[in-house]
């Protein structure tokens, strides 16, 4: 699956407008979710658009959703040699990432790209690769909102990005909690000005 924004292995946008959370259980994805564009924002009346954000193994964007017992495995067929070749081909002379780099997109997660007011319960990401540019997480690219929780579960994927890269979540936002979650995947920041990299967040 290749998308420019709001792209997921099961659904692109899980937006629940009600105040009560909707529960989804046992979702699975074993396909590759690829980012087709880096971040680009514009506002031109009715033609406003945002590209290059919100990519996830299950969902690109979630709001007021409880996701439990779900599993995602992305890029599991990619070999280490293929990854190294792709990454090396995506550097400019000064070490900056180019548009040819596989490290594209903001808010990229093994399960969800970005979640607001959501819970992830006992979800896992299997051995594979989660690749993005900024705000890249093994389970979630970014979290925001009250009572947001990740409980249980694990990440086994290799997580690579440029800035704000975490084994579980890239940035743990306002009033959010992460507990009982393990990460066994490699986490690394690559390219010029790489920064803010953590095993969990």
Regions found by a protein language model. Give the residues of each.
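Surface-exposed loop/turn motifs in large extracellular/passenger domains
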Residues: 1-201
């Amino acid at each position: 699956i290749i998308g420019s924004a709001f792209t997921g292995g099961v659904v692109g946008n899980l937006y629940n407008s009600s105040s009560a959370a909707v529960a989804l259980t046992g979702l699975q994805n074993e396909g590759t979710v690829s980012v087709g564009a880096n971040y680009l924002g514009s506002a031109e009346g009715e033609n406003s658009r945002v590209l290059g954000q919100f990519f996830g193994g299950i969902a690109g964007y979630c709001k007021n959703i409880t996701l439990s017992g779900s599993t995602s495995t992305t890029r599991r067929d990619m070999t280490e040699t293929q990854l190294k070749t792709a990454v090396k081909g995506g550097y400019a002379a000064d070490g900056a990432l180019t548009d040819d780099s596989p490290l594209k997109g903001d808010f990229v997660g093994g399960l969800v790209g970005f979640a607001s007011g959501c819970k992830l319960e006992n979800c896992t990401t299997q051995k594979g690769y989660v690749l993005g540019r900024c705000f890249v997480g093994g389970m979630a690219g970014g979290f925001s909102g009250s009572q947001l929780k990740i409980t249980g579960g694990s990440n086994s994927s290799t997580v690579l990005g440029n800035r704000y890269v975490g084994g579980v979540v890239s940035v743990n936002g306002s009033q959010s909690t992460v507990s009982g979650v393990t990460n066994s995947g490699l986490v690394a920041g690559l390219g010029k000005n790489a920064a803010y990299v953590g095993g969990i967040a």
